[in-house]
Amino acid sequence: MSKYYYLVAGLPELTLEDSKLSYTVADFKTELYPALSEDDKKLIDLFYLKFDNANVLKLLKDKDAAIDPRGNYSSEELAEYISQLKDGDEVSDSVFPSYLSTFISEYFSLPAEDGFLYEDRLAALYYAYAMECRNQFVSSWFGFNLTLNNILVALTARKFKLDIAPLIVGDTEVCEALRTSNARDFGLGTEVDYLEQLVKISETEELVDREKKLDQLRWDWMEVATFFDYFTVERLFVFLLQLEMIERWISLDKEKGNQLFRSIIAALKDEVQIPAEFR
């Protein structure tokens, strides 16, 4: 296992309440990423793939769309892979993640059913791919985040008396419980140790405060999970996750945040679907 004494020692201390940053997710990719071992680069790539996911969705809808430069692939690379897969060709897993190839192939070959959300299908494939990672922390992080997001969706759907099952992303045991259980705690009271905390957070009336509490829960979870990882790639992965959280809050003031989340809830009521932004 590689140790990154100088890299980690030089990282700034972060808190969720930070209102300014001297470092960004993009800076990490250009300045620190090149110093990582090849195996550790693959782990960090899992973080940046979330931007590739969004970019693929954009390009499938509009081949000339501007993409987020924080992804692992350029617009030219993505366009080439999309073209190959559209034509029925294969793209090697060594150059392009298998789950993205699967998703793009399905996009062109399978008819979309009513109410089908491509974002949900891609999210399910992404989480399954990341959770197969051999790094225990990284795999656990994606599992934790999938469970947290799905429980939130289930609680929201139950509140508005919607059918929960089609809104759950993934195929884990927790996913199955959320789809099928009518129990107050979905039968997960002993399996998900933060369930009651999550229920209380979901009942917070102030929407921005609720989202901040959720991010604090995520923040606390990753800090506990990597407590003994001092100079490892896990610490760098956590740094990236925390950077992204802070960047998002800096760019989203409270008033705009309230408007955003109210529009999400309104869409939920009107369309009987959980918008991708809510995940």
How should each PLM-predicted stretch be described?
Residues 1-279:
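Extended alpha-helical surfaces
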